[in-house]
Amino acid sequence: MKFNALVLSAVAQVASAHYFFDTNIVGGVAQPAFKYVRESSRATKYNPIKFSSNPAADIRDGSTADGPDIVCNQGAFKSAGKTQVMTVNAGEEIRLKLAVGAKFQHPGPALVYMSKAPTGSVKAYDGSGDWFKIFQEGVCGNGDFTSDAWCTYNRDWVAAKIPKDTP
């Protein structure tokens, strides 16, 4: 199956809206930053997208978690033409690596979703179609629920296997 890794990583960005991914790793090989991930046009790359009851007061750059930018990040569709498409086999694991040397430092789950480009090239797909969950992880231990009880805590990646029945 061919897909852009960003389509896979989009909801991982929702679950950890302070973070963004720039690299994917398949078969143990890390790819260059933004080779297979659409780059956002945000002036400050590491800038949280927020839910807001008062958007005029606390949104730094106009992106909200219930708007179109949450799918691939602000302005990311503009870089779709230069973003390469990686072929990943059904059943294979893909690891999404956080950018700017970040590690997850907030408690919470990791959720990974996929969306199929309806027709044509995935480069022309803006992510506005249907999504389905392929992976989730939450609490892994008896640690502190405000930190290290969560599987993702202090990691710089999220990994998921592409479902074997993916066309």
Task: Please describe what each predicted stretch is.
Residues 1-22:
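Fungal secretory targeting signals
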Residues 16-167:
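Structured recognition/catalytic domains enriched at protein termini
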